[in-house]
Amino acid sequence: MTRGVLLNMAKFYGQEPLPAGKAYTQADIKAAAKKQGVSIQKGDVVLFHSGYMTANLDKTELVPGQPGLGTSGAEYLAQLGVVAAGADSWALEALPSEDHTQAFPVHQILLARHGVYILENMVTQALVDDGVSEFMFVLGVPKLEGAVQAIINPIAIR
């Protein structure tokens, strides 16, 4: 259990859903948080809303590209000491990535270098609809040993 922060990047950029490959930079994250009147603190879980999940609910094929966290944004969140970062998309990070020579660079920055958890396929629309930017984030522990990923059901309490 910790504090959750939702950044509505679709509203920040004025487009929903955001286009594939749109990367959230450190400057974008700072500006979006300021615009929403929230701060990101050590120990927070930060979720991003791009409109990706809602726009793709009725599709039968996985869309190959998506908006998401960029490398400077990932480094910024890690420097702040967040516990986890998540988004309403299947990979959290922008695809195609900013650097086409690296596979999933944001995953490498957050998970491998800084130990920041990644949350994918987060349902953020209800929080956006209610205008929520801050909430209590509750996440149970899956009863799996030795796994590197799991299906979880987090709860946002407003």
Question: Where is each model-derived feature located?
Answer:
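Active-/binding-site microenvironments in catalytic and ligand-binding cores
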Residues: 1-158
